Amino acid sequence: MQNNCHLSVLVHEQAKRYGDREMLVYQEFGDKEWRSLSWNEVSRMVMRISNALLNLGVRPQECLGIFSQNSVQYIATDFGAWGVRAVTIPFYATSSEQQIQFMVNDARIRFLFVGEQEQYDKARRIFSLCPSMERIIVYDPTVRMSTHDPNAIYFSDFLRLGDNLPRQTEVEQLQAEASYDDIANILYTSGTTGDSKGVILPHSQFHAAFEANGKCVPVTESDRVMNFLPYTHIFERGWALYAMTQGATMIVNTHPQEVQQSMRETHPTCMSAVPRFWEKVYMGVMDKIERSGAVQRRLFRHALSVGRRHNIEYLSRGKTPPVALHLEYEMLNRTVFSLVRKELGLENAHFFPTAGAAVSAHVEEFVHSIGINMMVGYGLTESLATVSCDHLGEPYTVGSVGRLIEGIQIRISEEGEVLLKGPTITPGYYNREDLTKAAFTDDGFFRTGDAGYLKNGELYLTERIKDLFKTSNGKYIAPQMIESKLLVDKFIDQIAVIADQRKFVSALIIPVYPLLEEYARANQIPFDNREQLCDNPRVIEMMRERIDTLQQQLAHYEQVKRFTLLPHHFSLEKGELTNTLKIRRRVLNENYKEQIEKMYLD
């Protein structure tokens, strides 16, 4: 049921409707047992937070920071802050001290909510460098706070400031005064170039996004929605809040690396995901099939072929499958695909929005073939996530990012850049009029930085404009497209394509070391460490053969001619990845200059 009211009162309005129905399923800090809270219970917690914030002197449109993993406390803090017209600024739990310091000072944050020990320790170290900071509020009760830290309190103590709702009349007055022009969030994006900017997201953007999403991705109150990505990620934030407007139950996954176990334990019907999640699902399933007997392999390959014909060649194009094909698919769906979905914890799968990077057509077809509705989409922080997406139950094309959501205007510039206008587009960047002016055309269209085109009403993306490489031979290379094709290999964990102003394409590759070590032992390849594996000619030849197989469909000038295996992962700490785990090519070029140059020696 749609309940697109102002976020300042959403939880309370839903509590009137759903009462003691389950709203949040979660695990306590450090505990593996799944618990739940009802709409009524969360509403009461949110009221206490709103009252506590007023007791601390929080003012309308004041910025509050949340530096935490996903948690019940995180969700409640958002709503409690909106209940007094405050602005929340979410930080990634992996943010560096330098990033935190910049965001706190830029937004003049007085109160910073933190999750676990790592976040508390970082916040404490930068406290004296942030003149505006007054208090650190710690969610996890097991965090060891310094005995010499008078500026930190536990969340439980903070909540007591709101006991008996001493300021409830003022809270309700503020909610009555709340405007859709109020800022709800400021999301700082570092991007792949390292420049940090705060994207302003007013309540009006959320309101428009919820209305549009309801017409293409219809969540219902019976859905159980897994929150996999961090709430700092605009895709998860927009998606989770929209699902709450529909009365769905939220499953709060605190640590992304544990999501597959969480899915098996909680059986979600929906979840927003990035392509890398589905790539790992694909590799895991296919690896298990390859290890099975010959009969099982033949059966599964046949089932995939039937699933592809039924779901891709017919249903995706809006056509009715032949009766014989449909009957065979239904039989295989009950006997083969249902077992795969059950193993993944997706036996109740409804649909799964997917965005954040390019999706390999191979992986997308696999997911659809086994009976999971993957709804590919496109969006940015500045567009409050969704710009376009596949619409549930309607035809779609593998390789596109779907049709535009309602209210979005699109234009493709002469340079091929996707330009956007509409009620879900940000008004600009916090404290950065210069960046705001540069981000929009004279007639108000937002410059996405993405190259793309429209075909038959669907949007197709080609590459980030700034990421396009030009080889020394004058050929243009789209590195993300090449990377997405190679990442489906079970032995490849991370990859960075090199080509700009070079005579051919090369790549830095981090293997999946547990699998590579297993391969080496099975083939009597001696090694004492990862460096020896990376340099072993037999390992390199095996990787070369797999890469050549995957890139057969690429143009000759797009194919990786040489590669280097690296013994260590690209890391956040070295600045090689953004907080959303996208590679920073400039930093990689600097950090691995020696290895790159070696690949281009004649």
Label every model-predicted segment.
Residues G19-E22, V138, I153-S156, D163-Y188, ...:
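Conserved pre-ATP/AMP-binding loop-to-beta segment of ANL
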Residues F469, Q494-V497, K503, I540, ...:
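Conserved C-terminal "lid"/linker of ANL adenylate-forming enzymes
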